[in-house]
Each structure stands twice: as C-alpha cells, then as structure tokens.
Swiss-Prot record:
Result, substituting residue 335 to A: Reduces catalytic activity 6.5-fold
Organism: Arabidopsis thaliana (Mouse-ear cress)
The protein's annotated pathway: Flavonoid metabolism
Summary of the knockout phenotype: No visible phenotype under normal growth conditions, but mutant plants do not accumulate 7-O-rhamnosylated flavonols. Increased concentrations of auxin precursors and auxin metabolites.
Annotated gene: UGT89C1
Function: Flavonol 7-O-rhamnosyltransferase that catalyzes the transfer of rhamnose from UDP-rhamnose to the 7-OH position of 3-O-glycosylated flavonols, such as kaempferol 3-O-rhamnoside, kaempferol 3-O-glucoside, quercetin 3-O-glucoside, quercetin 3-O-galactoside, quercetin 3-O-rhamnoside and isorhamnetin 3-O-glucoside. Is able to glycosylate the flavonols quercetin and kaempferol to yield quercetin 7-O-rhamnoside and kaempferol 7-O-rhamnoside. Shows a strict specificity for UDP-rhamnose as sugar donor. Does not act on 3-O-glycosylated anthocyanins.
Sequence positions that bind quercetin: 21
Protein name, entry field: Flavonol 7-O-rhamnosyltransferase
Active site positions, chain numbering: 21, 119
Residue numbers binding UDP: 18, 250, 315, 332, 336-337, 340
C-alpha cells in the first residue's frame, strides 16, 4: 500500500452518528491508516465505543480521538447521540444538533500549532455544510464521504424537490472531493454521470466494498445472543445455503402487522432462519422517552426453536452472511447490507423501506437483475403464503439472480485486491490529501 508521495497526511475524520454511516466510515479510516496516515476521529461520548477496534489495531501515535460533547437539542431526548435510536424523521434535528459542533471544533483547531493541523477533513457528506466552513477557515481540504453508490447519488441529485437535502448536495459538490462505498465495475456509467454532471471537478473515488477490519467486533450495539452462540448454531446446520437471514438494518422497525406476516411466512416456509429484530426507537420528544416495540407473535419463538433463531438488538451480520450455512438474505436493501450480502455470496430478497433503498432496488433488482423483490415499501404487508414460497425457494443455486450476484461478487473482490480499482483509488486518495 504505497502512495505517490513520501509525506503522509494527517486526516481529521468526522463520521455521521448512525451505524450505517459510522461503520463504513471507520472501515475507510482503517484503510487510510494502513496507508501510513495519521488520523484523528471526532465523535461524541456515547459513540466513542465504535472506535475500540481501531484503537486495538493502531498505535496512539497514528490513531487519535477527539471527543466533543453532544450538543443538546430540544427535540432529541437526553442521552441520545445516534440517529438509529430515533425515528428517521428526526434526522433534521440530528443535522441541526451536529451543526453546533462547528464552534467547539473551530476553538479546538485554533489552539493547535500549525504543524498539528490536519491536511484534510474526511467528513460525512451529511455534515458537509458546516465541515466545509471549518475547512475553509483553516485552509484544509474537505473531502466528503457517502456510504452509498453512484446510481443513488445521480438519482437523488437530479430530483427537483430535494427539500433540506439541497444544502447537503451543494456542500458536497463544493468539497474538494467525494468518496463513495462502491466499485467502478459495478456501475461505471453512473460514476461517470456523477463526475461529469454534478461535481465541479473529477475527484470521485470509488473505494468499496469497504469490508470489516476485524472479525467478530461489536459494530453496532448489544446483542441478545453472543456472536459465539450464533456461530455455533450456524455450524450445527447440516446443509450449506439452507439458512435465511432476515435483517432490516439499524433504522427500520416493522409494524406489528408486518412482523406477524413475516413470522407467519417464516413458519410456513419451514426454512432455517436467523431473524434480527431491532431495538425500539425513542420518540422525538425530549420529555417522553417511551418506546414503540416490535411485536413478535406470542408462541412463535417456541414453535420455531428447532429451526429458527431470533436475535434482539445488534446481530453479527457480516459473520452470519459469510457463513457457509446461510444462502439468502431478506433485507431492506440498504447499501451497506447489499455489499455485505454480495461479498457473502447470498441471494438478496429485497423489501425496500425508505430513502435510498428504492434507488438501490432499481439498480440491483431492475438494472442488474441480481436480486428478487419481495416487498414494496415501508407500509406494505407481504402475503405470508407468497413470501413463504419465495423463502423456501431462495436456497436454489440455479436461480438466475444468484448466478448474476456471484459474478458481481467476483468483480467486487477483484476491485479491493492489490492493483484493483478500489485499492488503487485508496492509494490515490491518501496521496491527494498531501498535495
């Protein structure tokens, strides 16, 4: 892992506090550290644990942390510092709260000697409006990171009604460069579209798929079942590709009706399964910390205990998807989950819910024919009989979507090998930070 210059950069990393953003951003940070950079990561106190694995792998000389208090906000309950603890509509309040980190960060940087200032800020695109201002004040390069694909970017940025995301788009396009968690051979036409139509420059680096840097680490919270027990359960499954993994990411909570339909489908299908059920979200009201719970039907877990495993809270998703027993994945089609499923070589069953899930579905299901759609949106309730049939058939190795996905997997793994497109882009990114 070499760069084109002998100087190694000092990079200030500012991730967005939601696991779908934080985790790939830290995976990217690991790759930058491997290339000789010194990194300082800015987080708030309750997000500091995300950095434990990086701390264990890199020396304090090269990996540093800057912990600033989470700015209070009237619409965010006390003690909440991550979006996954809130419903998605709270994102505007999270943006507002995090923008108040501008002044404390400026104060911190102002007290540093010039030799200790970073060469670049690698910040979340979601925070780019105020990160760019900080970078400009200290003549530092601001490079934006988006953990999504170029197709989604090209669709979102082409929409006329972008509401409050318009400021994010503008700030991202005005930053020094853009890094995305995709690989060039997956979507070359869309990478070129973003580069030529939306950016004021050609500095876009596809660096994916960004893979976990340490197996078995806690990458998202607490689990009701230890990863070792999950692994042992999978090891006990006699047939390869016989288990369906069901998970909808860090933000999605199913309604009671959706949960009942899914439970019925799993039971009717007779397939082996692991179902990750999310923690409840806090309401967006600082005076009301009550929660809305998912409702697993009474008696379900007892009836399926010989074939199924229900995990409440965080699940070791990467480990599950890469296990030989797992053959398919019922997913919301969040981009990180798509890449993890692709690398794991499992059949993707798409139930898009919100935001970029629909753009990902267009790319993966409609354009690339590498997944099967089983749900329509956040409000849809699947027919349990139909879903049961799809689940039962999803382990078939001759499904055309599985064959296509495996070809994409080969391209993904080539991209991150030494000499591959994403590998070289990471080298170039680190070199560019020093120029």
């Amino acid at each position: 892992m070499t760069t084109t210059t002998t100087k190694k950069p000092h990079v200030l990393v500012i991730p967005f506090p939601q696991s779908g953003h934080m985790v790939p951003h830290l995976d990217l940070t690991h790759q930058i550290l491997l290339r000789g950079a010194t990194v300082t990561v800015l987080v708030t106190p309750k997000n500091s644990s995300y950095l434990d694995a990086l701390r264990s792998l890199h020396s304090p000389e090269h990996f540093k942390t800057l912990i600033l208090p989470f700015p209070s906000h009237p619409c965010i309950p006390s003690g909440v510092e991550s979006l996954q603890q809130l419903p998605l509509e709270a994102i505007v309040h999270m943006f507002d709260a995090l923008s108040r980190l501008h002044d404390p960060l400026v104060d911190f940087l102002s007290r540093q000697p010039p030799s200790d200032l970073p060469d670049a800020i690698l910040g979340s695109s979601f925070l780019s409006p105020w990160i760019n201002k900080v970078a400009d004040a200290f003549s530092i390069k601001s490079i934006s990171f988006l953990p999504i694909n170029a197709h989604s970017i090209s669709v979102m940025w082409a929409q006329e009604d972008r509401s409050f995301f318009n400021d994010l788009e503008t700030a991202t396009t005005e930053s020094y460069g853009l890094v995305i968690n995709s690989f060039y051979d997956l979507e070359p036409e869309f990478v070129e579209t973003v580069k030529t139509r939306f950016l004021n420059h050609h500095r876009i680096w596809t660096v994916g798929p960004l893979l976990p840097f340490k197996a078995g680490v806690d990458r998202g919270g607490q689990s009701s079942i230890p990863p070792a027990k999950v692994s042992a359960w999978l090891d006990s499954c006699p047939e390869d590709n016989s288990v369906v993994y069901v998970g909808f990411g860090s933000q999605i909570r199913l309604t009671a009706e959706q949960t009942a339909a899914l439970a019925a489908a799993l039971e009717k299908s007779s397939v082996r399964f692991i179902w990750a059920v999310r923690d409840a979200a806090k309401k967006v009201n600082s005076s009301d910390n009550s929660v809305e719970e998912d409702v697993i039907p009474a008696g379900f877990e007892e009836r399926v205990k010989e074939k199924g495993l229900v995990i409440r809270g965080w699940a070791p998703q990467t480990m599950i998807l890469e296990h030989r027993a797992v053959g398919s994945y019922l997913t919301h089609l969040g981009w990180g989950s798509v890449l993890e499923g692709m690398v794991g070589g499992v059949m993707l069953l798409a139930w898009p819910m919100q935001a970029d899930h629909f753009f990902n579905t267009t790319l993966i299901v409609d354009k690339l024919r590498a997944a099967v759609r089983v749900g329509e949106n956040r409000d849809s309730v699947p027919d349990s009989d139909k879903l049961a049939r799809i689940l039962a058939e999803s382990a078939r190795e001759d499904l055309p979507e599985r064959v296509t996905l495996m070809k994409l997997r080969e391209k993904a793994m080539e991209a991150i090998k030494e000499g591959g497109s994403s590998y070289k882009n990471l080298d170039e990114l680190v070199a560019e930070m020093c120029l």
